[in-house]
Amino acid sequence: MPALACLRRLCRHLSPQAVLFLLFVFCLFSVFVSAYYLYGWNRGLEPSADASESDCGDPPPVAPSRLLPIKPVQAVAPSRTDPLVLVFVESLYSQLGQEVVAILESSRFKYRTEIAPGKGDMPTLTDKGRGRFALIIYENILKYVNLDAWNRELLDKYCVAYGVGIIGFFKANENSLLSAQLKGFPLFLHSNLGLKDCSINPKSPLLYVTRPSEVEKGVLPGEDWTVFQSNHSTYEPVLLAKTRSSESIPHLGADAGLHAALHATVVQDLGLHDGIQRVLFGNNLNFWLHKLVFVDAVAFLTGKRLSLPLDRYILVDIDDIFVGKEGTRMKVEDVKALFDTQNELRTHIPNFTFNLGYSGKFFHTGTDAEDAGDDLLLSYVKEFWWFPHMWSHMQPHLFHNQSVLAEQMALNKKFAVEHGIPTDMGYAVAPHHSGVYPVHVQLYEAWKQVWGIRVTSTEEYPHLKPARYRRGFIHNGIMVLPRQTCGLFTHTIFYNEYPGGSSELDKIINGGELFLTVLLNPISIFMTHLSNYGNDRLGLYTFKHLVRFLHSWTNLRLQTLPPVQLAQKYFQIFSEEKDPLWQDPCEDKRHKDIWSKEKTCDRFPKLLIIGPQKTGTTALYLFLGMHPDLSSNYPSSETFEEIQFFNGHNYHKGIDWYMEFFPIPSNTTSDFYFEKSANYFDSEVAPRRAAALLPKAKILSILINPADRAYSWYQHQRAHDDPVALKYTFHEVITAGPDASSKLRALQNRCLVPGWYATHIERWLSAFHANQILVLDGKLLRTEPAKVMDTVQKFLGVTSTVDYHKTLAFDPKKGFWCQLLEGGKTKCLGKSKGRKYPEMDLDSRAFLKDYFRDHNIELSKLLYKMGQTLPTWLREDLQNTR
């Protein structure tokens, strides 16, 4: 108070002129403070006058000094979040959003996309105290900045609590302010700029793959760039660039030398402002360096949980050695260049070796100069790796006789032995990838018989495009690796005649598709051809420049391995890919073209009865077989009427094995095949596998009270002399604790787990559309089968219908409905069906009623959502629950 009184007395003694003078001094001081705040970072980025120039003749960028000490930020807590990325996009079809997703998919990172809410609900961020997302990405950072207060606070608190970072993109448009402060942040944006000469801040802590030793000379794509500016210590520039013209950025001053300053196009927020780490991009991902830094940003903000190791394995296959018309083959100088380039590449890739695939029939079929090239190549036989094609370069799927295929291979092997070519590499490639996928069984058997093949590769699994989805699998003891293209094909042999111009090839190499293939794949097998190594030798040009570019801009450790070791490394990294996923060959034209013409997709079933077990599936199987247009599978010698293909070891026998259970259709329009395997229902793998091979199939499931189903399974096991079922009562089985023996727990699971109906149907709904699935009332099927069969026929859409009221009759001795034959006789199921056994004890009934209560409630909700009628037993159960 005394101080305030003194101030009042002082003011009374000041003249108006003195007050104005003091105001002027205060304003001048404010201007100096503002100038320091605005320009401090920018001046810190200017190259020092005495800095030594780099190899490219450009002064190295100087990162700004932090004005405040670093404060502790919540560390990434990998154990507290799932390795899932939440991507907020403008729309499902926006280009930048798709590019972000493509990089995540290529890296095999799991993600979830959401339309960015301006207002409205935010996705659930936690589940039982665990964070659902390890990283948040905003296609448009303004959608994050302008979130309503509730959602913004919700998201920010989540990021702070779980150590989750944010990546955002700012894409200027014609309505963007030239200069503005990002709302709520000590960060200024200057937009709609043209930039050039991009460099990397070597002090940036997020750099991992990116090597900061180069300057990308030239104009950056687009004129809608945004640069970031701040004097707060939380911001660290990552990428820096100059303005294209000599004009200064508006509002940054008219200093004549200011245009030469470096401006941040990507900035890292260290989290010192609000505890959240972020990486902000001043444009989209069209600029290749943004893609590289984006990969590093994902790695840094997730504590390297979402990152690949720095090791990259590269194998370059040269297909069609000795194959090719005159004028496209290698001559003596080309062979020498191949050998010299291999040695040159070994300076960056230890023991790099070209892998040569040959068809011996075409040896010495070129010009004299090309034949001399063949001879020189064979004189270098020990310098390269070798693998066989077919002798006459024929497509294997055209050979239906395995012995003929083996004869062709034997001719190629004889040629190899005669010319000293090693035959024990264990790797082969089929011409045009024929027979590898879709699988031609004869090819796999002949490969093993003649060559002892252990590894092959293809670009066709699961599909040619998009390339980022290509995967590996193992079939019949042969490891199949994904193969990549590199922009070179049999017809691309001259640099100046490259499609789109030579600059297109350079673009693919220097930060383009080929560069990204290596960046985002730990293992890359590249397909090239003999013709790419003659004439302008584009194959050598491509890989020399690619390796140089990778060495200049990345910290990747380039390596190579022979094919068998490479395959072992691949499945060590991607062990989840060992099991194949068979698809309908007729759904992909390329697959159909390399699939045997003797095979037809019409042999696949159009209906699956999936179970679960002990609900009446065998009766339904019998009733469907009575329809003239419906045909069931042939019986299995092991599993009787059930094929059990999609859920177990039979799946690895392939689709040829599966099709053998169905006849070749006489009428593809009316013939309707179906199969019943009751253990498909609760299988974790069957829905996905079935949807891949039979995407248009109809699915039938029969449900009875899960308590009755559990008891029926227990009695079924007793009837088959299961020692565990004979030893323990039903009540002991279903109430067994976690310390019970493994065999007892296994029986308990088979009694109880299939009764989690909603859980299993949800899994099938994730693979098939709801209108492809029909859930039948098992109790009604037992009492009124004709009524149920009318529903089934309508669901299947069969052209002719059967009146089951006239074809079914109740057999009082059996106690269920049977097929009515001529003369009033009936054909019923075997002795094992309809077995009589004691009633379930009341304690077990009460236990199961309580055990399945929540499952049944979820089932009722799910069936309502699917638009299907609730089974009578479920309605009764829910009424009694109330």
Curated annotation (Swiss-Prot):
Tissue and organ expression note: Widely expressed in adult and throughout development.
Residues modified by glycosylation: N231, N351, N401, N667
Transmembrane segments: 18-38
Top-level taxon in the UniProt lineage: Eukaryota
Binding-site residues, adenosine 3',5'-bisphosphate: K614, T615, G616, T617, T618, S712, W817, K833, G834, R835, K836, Y837
Region spans: Heparan sulfate N-sulfotransferase 1: 599-882
Pfam families, per the entry: HSNSD-CE (PF12062), HSNSD_N (PF25119), Sulfotransfer_1 (PF00685)
Cytoplasmic topological segments: 1-17
Active site: K614
Protein name: Bifunctional heparan sulfate N-deacetylase/N-sulfotransferase 1
Species whose genome carries this gene: Mus musculus
Name of the coding gene: Ndst1
